[in-house]
């Protein structure tokens, strides 16, 4: 889940997707040709479709382990006079939001688990930026829970800028372009097969004006989503989860929920199985169609909705009695989760190919999973109902 050929998410960068849904120790979302559509759902977003096939590289500094978590990973120029409140810039406020999201989710998970604590790893980069991984394993309720945050400063080549701005004046030939990227990403795997897995990720990317073209426009975009992967369907749980996502979306635009729900269904598709990883949620990418302030507020609202969408379901299901059969089915569905992340997830596959920070890249994987040869649940069973919903996505609300 969670290095670029910007030096990799660890730190070099061959773009293949502007925003992979997962977040690593460096900006893994910088891994695709900018503005290049890559799924049907992306096409439905009515984005431009230039044909760029080049590969580019960018540079960021190598991360260095540190012993304590700083108040912020921002450069001093991005922080203003009060680090705790941060500057009025979108960079500063998004960085603050992703730290608060990590803290609040970790506290909620520890409380729900009843005793286990997160292990924390922190790193920084000499020129600014850094990251913080929080991972809980073998708790009373959670088999594995990871919540990662990252801030990256780097430089992209002019080819990437031209791809991002195909309508710019062709006579403008900008030089290397500094960029900023920040995000929070999490995957939560409970032990009880009746409690669902949850993934969420929210991120922001911004360029500075090119060094050789100070008048050129600055680029920015948001991406992210929250999705839900149960092993067994409790309709009240699925409706609750989707209702919280819809409520967050509807505060900003009534078109967001249906648009982003479809995008989520399309993205989390396991092609070789012809089924979805789970029961959906919301997903958006390369998103700058609206005012920047509005989209910052929208991303914040979505991140703040994670706990009310998920924790009540975990509290309801964590102590439900289960059998070995239930656990085996959960492990088979965990196998599907592993397949998607290692084969299709853009952040994971990019990080593995570019020598990224492996512990952050693989933090999304469950501790245990299972594969059985030619396993098919009997039609009409609870297991079959879940599989059918993954093959034939439904409208839950």
From Swiss-Prot:
The record ties this protein, via PROSITE patterns, to:
COPROGEN_OXIDASE (PS01021)
Pathway where it operates: Porphyrin-containing compound metabolism; protoporphyrin-IX biosynthesis; protoporphyrinogen-IX from coproporphyrinogen-III (O2 route): step 1/1
Q: Does the keyword tRNA-binding apply?
A: no
Alphabetical GO biological process terms:
chlorophyll biosynthetic process; protoporphyrinogen IX biosynthetic process
E.C. code: 1.3.3.3
For this UniProt entry, the molecular function terms from Gene Ontology, in alphabetical order, are:
coproporphyrinogen oxidase activity; protein homodimerization activity
Listed binding positions for substrate are: 185, 201-203, 355-360
- Reactions performed catalytically: coproporphyrinogen III + O2 + 2 H(+) = protoporphyrinogen IX + 2 CO2 + 2 H2O
Q: Where is the composition biased (Polar residues)?
A: 79-90
**Which residues does the annotated region (Important for dimerization) include?**
135-144, 337-372
* Protein name per UniProt: Oxygen-dependent coproporphyrinogen-III oxidase, chloroplastic
Which organism is the protein's source? Nicotiana tabacum
Q: Could you read off the lineage of the organism from its UniProt record?
A: Eukaryota, Viridiplantae, Streptophyta, Embryophyta, Tracheophyta
């Amino acid at each position: 889940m969670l290095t670029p050929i910007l030096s990799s998410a660890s730190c070099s960068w061959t773009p293949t997707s502007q925003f992979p849904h997962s977040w690593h120790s460096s900006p893994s979302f910088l891994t695709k040709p900018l503005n290049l559509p890559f799924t049907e759902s992306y096409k439905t977003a009515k984005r431009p479709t230039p044909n760029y096939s080049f590969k580019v590289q960018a540079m960021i500094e190598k991360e260095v382990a540190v012993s304590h978590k700083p108040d912020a990973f921002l450069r001093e120029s991005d922080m203003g006079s009060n680090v705790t409140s941060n500057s009025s810039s979108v960079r500063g406020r998004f960085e603050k939001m992703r730290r608060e999201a990590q803290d609040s989710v970790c506290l909620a998970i520890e409380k729900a688990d009843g005793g286990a604590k997160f292990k924390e790893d922190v790193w920084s980069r000499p020129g600014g930026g850094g990251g913080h991984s929080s991972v809980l394993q073998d708790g009373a309720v959670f088999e594995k829970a990871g919540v990662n945050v990252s801030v990256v400063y780097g430089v992209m080549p002019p080819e990437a800028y031209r791809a991002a701005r195909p309508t710019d004046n062709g006579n403008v030939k900008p030089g290397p372009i500094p960029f900023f990227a920040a995000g929070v990403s999490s995957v939560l795997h409970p032990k009880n097969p009746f409690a669902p897995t949850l993934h969420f990720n929210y991120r922001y990317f911004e360029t500075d004006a090119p060094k050789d073209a100070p008048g050129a426009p600055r680029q920015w975009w948001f991406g992210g989503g929250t999705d839900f992967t149960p092993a067994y369907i409790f309709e009240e749980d699925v409706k609750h989860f989707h209702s919280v996502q819809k409520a967050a979306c509807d505060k900003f635009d009534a078109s967001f929920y249906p648009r982003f729900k479809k995008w989520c269904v399309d993205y989390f598709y396991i092609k070789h199985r012809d089924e979805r990883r789970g029961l959906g949620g919301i997903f958006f990418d390369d998103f700058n169609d609206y005012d920047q302030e509005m989209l910052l507020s929208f991303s914040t609202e979505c991140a703040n909705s994670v706990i009310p969408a998920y924790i009540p379901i975990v509290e309801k299901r964590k102590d439900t009695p289960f059998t070995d059969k239930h656990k085996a089915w959960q492990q088979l569905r965990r196998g599907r989760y592993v397949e998607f992340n290692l084969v299709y997830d853009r952040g994971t596959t990019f990080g593995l190919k570019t020598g990224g920070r492996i512990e952050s890249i693989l933090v999304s994987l469950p501790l245990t999973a299972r594969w059985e040869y030619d396993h098919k649940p009997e039609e009409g069973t609870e297991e079959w109902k879940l599989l059918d919903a993954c093959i034939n996505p439904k409208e839950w609300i």
